[in-house]
Amino acid sequence: MVQGRQAGGHQGGWLYDEAERITTFELLTQALKLSCVPLIASGGIADAKAVRDALMMGADMVAVGTAFLTTTESVIDELWKAKLLSACAKDTHLTRLFSGKLARGLVNDYLREFADIDGVIKHAQIPPYPELNAMTKELRATAKHLKDPNLMSLWAGTSVDKCRDESISELIDRLLN
């Protein structure tokens, strides 16, 4: 799996923060030079052009994530789904604030309030995963119960603007044509 910075949710682990800033296609180019195993491109892939581009570059497969969250078959919270359907790439941000592990999600009041101690921009010290994840578990559960998207972890990739209220079948058709 070759996952670029555009991917939503928790990111793959890296040894260096600079590597966390590499795009999917930059990372795929590097991986193709060094690897002889099948490669799956992931991150920012949510339309037919991105699928074609990744495959033409040499990826053996692609993984699509965020676009499936708004399908009619998805079981995510309706508030999260509504936020995804009205968002664009600039509404997403890499953060460690919910779990201690780098993840991309929609910016909300929680992320804005604690941006100074996020640890992504200023490398501040915050508890690592899984400690911070355990510390925020009750917050996330309460936010879901209260239907408060400003305290939820609303994971989303930068291709969020490609999300549609459609069936999985319609999404697959759109990805392939």
Model-derived segments and spans:
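A structural preference for short, pocket-lining loop segments at secondary-structure junctions
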Residues: 1-2
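Conserved active-site-proximal phosphate/metal-binding subdomains
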Residues: 5-40, 46-177
